[in-house]
UniProtKB/Swiss-Prot annotation:
PANTHER family: EUKARYOTIC TRANSLATION INITIATION FACTOR 2C. It comes from Homo sapiens. Required for RNA-mediated gene silencing (RNAi). Binds to short RNAs such as microRNAs (miRNAs) or short interfering RNAs (siRNAs), and represses the translation of mRNAs which are complementary to them. Lacks endonuclease activity and does not appear to cleave target mRNAs. Also required for transcriptional gene silencing (TGS) of promoter regions which are complementary to bound short antigene RNAs (agRNAs). This is Protein argonaute-1. Disulfide bonds: none annotated. Changing Y418F: In NEDLBAS; uncertain significance. Changing E195K: In NEDLBAS; uncertain significance. Residues 670-675 are annotated as: Impairs access of bound RNA to the active site. It is found in: Cytoplasm, P-body. The gene is AGO1. Keywords: Cytoplasm, Disease variant, Epilepsy, Intellectual disability, Repressor, Ribonucleoprotein, RNA-binding, RNA-mediated gene silencing, Transcription, Transcription regulation, Translation regulation, Ubl conjugation. It is linked to Neurodevelopmental disorder with language delay and behavioral abnormalities, with or without seizures: An autosomal dominant neurodevelopmental disorder characterized by global developmental delay with intellectual disability of varying severity, speech and motor delay, and behavioral abnormalities, including autistic features. About half of patients develop seizures.
Amino acid sequence: MEAGPSGAAAGAYLPPLQQVFQAPRRPGIGTVGKPIKLLANYFEVDIPKIDVYHYEVDIKPDKCPRRVNREVVEYMVQHFKPQIFGDRKPVYDGKKNIYTVTALPIGNERVDFEVTIPGEGKDRIFKVSIKWLAIVSWRMLHEALVSGQIPVPLESVQALDVAMRHLASMRYTPVGRSFFSPPEGYYHPLGGGREVWFGFHQSVRPAMWKMMLNIDVSATAFYKAQPVIEFMCEVLDIRNIDEQPKPLTDSQRVRFTKEIKGLKVEVTHCGQMKRKYRVCNVTRRPASHQTFPLQLESGQTVECTVAQYFKQKYNLQLKYPHLPCLQVGQEQKHTYLPLEVCNIVAGQRCIKKLTDNQTSTMIKATARSAPDRQEEISRLMKNASYNLDPYIQEFGIKVKDDMTEVTGRVLPAPILQYGGRNRAIATPNQGVWDMRGKQFYNGIEIKVWAIACFAPQKQCREEVLKNFTDQLRKISKDAGMPIQGQPCFCKYAQGADSVEPMFRHLKNTYSGLQLIIVILPGKTPVYAEVKRVGDTLLGMATQCVQVKNVVKTSPQTLSNLCLKINVKLGGINNILVPHQRSAVFQQPVIFLGADVTHPPAGDGKKPSITAVVGSMDAHPSRYCATVRVQRPRQEIIEDLSYMVRELLIQFYKSTRFKPTRIIFYRDGVPEGQLPQILHYELLAIRDACIKLEKDYQPGITYIVVQKRHHTRLFCADKNERIGKSGNIPAGTTVDTNITHPFEFDFYLCSHAGIQGTSRPSHYYVLWDDNRFTADELQILTYQLCHTYVRCTRSVSIPAPAYYARLVAFRARYHLVDKEHDSGEGSHISGQSNGRDPQALAKAVQVHQDTLRTMYFA
């Protein structure tokens, strides 16, 4: 979700800012690591030191889409040239703001206009008023960037942004900060009536000493402009409409409704008058039976079917009277349209969740190796020719054509300590290391374990199971996590309904049962049920395995299973070699990771989920989780104070120490809301400490982790590129040139890019009682990226932030209502929510016995 520079998303509750916490200044720049020459997809913007005039515009009717508003303003500027606008080229943001280079001759008065736009069928009339608002100083912006002594004036950045986007907003379809245009010369269908559109992202950002234009290629899913009949066939997998001589079944209608609800359609039965409507529902009855009250000329009202009406009024004999109608406009108005007279309107972005297949098609269509993406961005820049844009020229702005050169540093990777007799160490190379010949730092001995196979017996025979367990035991023994003897129980089962009775039987029959290995037949509701029963109901450790990995075992897959199992049972896979850890470890320190995940768009009833995890030892290796539900789309973690308090108590129970420092990595914060969220959450963390002990005031460092940005880094020297995808090396850090003019932020690409172009994570320090130097925090963050237990690779964000994401993701499965849902995003929207807030809160609460384990690994 992208909020504008001016702030919050609509509808989010944010507390007023009583005291504003100032983000810390950059404590100098980092020096550790091997220098590397990079190119960033940032282009220098040169702005004149002038005043820009800011006007407020008000358009009635006021709920028009921005596209219409832009048209209205464009007409107004052309039409009132002689009286008001002269040769000026105003720029407009599509909502309330207009900027000009010289003042309009209206003084401080409000001026009203009437603007007529020729429409299809009839003209549309708009009332527009303009009033002077303020002078925006670009000289101040210059001063802020160069001196670093005054805050960056956001209104100046906003004016620049509007000027830079004005032309593109008229030419293309804007989405957030990106622009898209219909496919030309390529076609990437996604299925289900959706297709890929390519476009570009553009934003202006304050950087060291200058403004920068961030340009990136981007892609998103749009609905294909096509007849609704064809859309329905795609959604329901009907190859040919003539194969559907019968009315839709209930389940077909429900699936179709879910996809088309909320989309705009245009009608084809009125000649040139292609009126557009928004779909609010799909009728249960076919067009031949769906009736509505028709008023006759005599004034009498009769019930008439949609099919009859179209025959009488338009002389149109429906070809598919057995198919339902679309209900459009307002529900209470009963406007019905047969599917066959409707087309899906072009240029509608798909905000609903993509299916797994669509997602993988999308990735295949959009993944570009780093050198290819670099080439594409450069080509995009040339084609955009910003310096020829009349609006940009009007404001005296100049844009450099070449990517910005930056010197980054490749940080040294930490050494990892394993256990066993030989206490081997592993040295990561390009973000990867090997566990062969090494044993877990602390391996668990598994004595009592069970197998539940939910794959059919013909797919997974007993000898296949036997081979799998033999191979798993061999690998686990090598890894120092011996699985002793045969399973105490090994049975086949079917369907989610058999999970709970089976698990209860296991819990009651086998005392000391440590683990249930569950074999799944592909994508199935059984997974959600296994996790609900295991994590929340009975407190039993479960490890799911796909049947394909049982039938065909590979050492890699089995080894990865062991990484997860050992941790779930309380083991430690490896630790950072103690002597190379940062000075912050000299006193007790807790690492917290926090995330908020929202339900997919269009799913208004499901709650948002917040998760906070905390480290429970000094390595840091073991973590404990807390999770809550809250109002949908709420960005602040409302219950943070209680969650942190729980974790501090757990830390004390685990270590017998009170942390003197709290390092908080916060994922998933929209840029426009940083100040409000920091304000609320920093006070919540302090509050948690004071509630435990009146004078307990550990130093807090609050770091926002952002992955959803468009900064990309490329090797300037071809010889430094890594692997097939030609990416920058793992450990590449940048904290100059493209970062904030004076606040404490940096980019760190901590993982090795395998596919596509690596996305460095952006770290923004919003509060720092602990006075970290740039080197200390960058190295600490990089080291934490090596402590993620599920793989022997460095990951793209620090382990605590990653775990918080996993915990929130797991809670989505705990919320699955097994009557309706599969938890896979393909269900009827809005169950698990006929339940009240208390029931939802209870559904995500993890069982006492699971609470202290890393069940989410």
